[in-house]
Design a protein with these regions (language model features):
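Carbohydrate-active catalytic/glycan-binding domains of CAZyme proteins
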Residues: 1-204
Length: 204
């Protein structure tokens, strides 16, 4: 399974592929998930796509447990792994009302490094007029009418006060249950050779 692989960042071959999941912490998880590996992917009889893997946990040594996450395909054909273990969710192919999307999200960026660092959640706010802002970041978001597709552009201010070129992410929305059983709106998107996940809580 050694490369070369096409990159999400550009079309040039590389010796690594798009990182879907790493070490991360999300609301409803009692501990950070770590070393999410030994992956298998399959398509079920009802045409849903899944990734099955084992995960270790922060401060629990070699203890590990299996998990299965559904993944969806974005508008450009790239896989987007949903943030939480599957609970039988079915994404609405016709999309979601804007009122169920706008609000405050906890967002993790899986990055592209392979090390022991944990991706910690940051708060992003999606506004009704198509803007997104968070910790030292602002940008735009757009849901494609009649689909669950979303396109997000973010930019970080540089040290000289200017704004760096925006990063673009293409992904999907899906309403699902977190691992505490709470119904939440989520998104998963990929771009810049990175995967980002967002989870909205309490109608904020």
């Amino acid at each position: 399974m050694n490369g070369k692989y096409p990159q999400k960042r550009a079309g040039n071959p590389a010796y690594f592929g798009l990182k879907l999941s790493g070490n991360y912490r999300l609301p409803s998880l009692p501990q950070a998930y770590m070393a999410t590996g030994h992956n298998s992917a399959f398509i079920s009889s009802d045409d849903k796509r899944y990734i099955v893997y084992h995960t270790r946990f922060e401060n629990r040594g070699e203890t590990h447990e299996p998990r299965a996450h559904q993944y969806l395909i974005n508008e450009e054909g790239w896989p987007c792994m949903l943030p939480y273990a599957t609970g039988g969710e079915t994404a609405s192919k016709s999309g979601y009302d804007k009122s169920s999307i706008v609000g405050e999200y906890y967002v993790v960026n899986q990055g592209n490094k392979i090390d022991k660092s944990i991706a910690e959640p940051e708060k992003w706010v999606f506004t009704e007029d198509g803007f997104v802002f968070g910790q030292g970041m602002d940008g735009t978001w757009e849901a494609k009418d009649g689909t669950y597709y979303v396109h997000i552009k973010t930019a970080l201010p540089s040290e000289d006060g200017t704004v760096d070129a925006a990063d673009s992410y293409s992904g999907v929305f899906c309403k699902m249950k977190d691992e505490a059983g709470t119904d939440v709106m989520t998104f998963s998107a990929v771009g810049n050779n990175e995967s980002i996940w967002g989870v909205k809580y309490n109608g904020k």
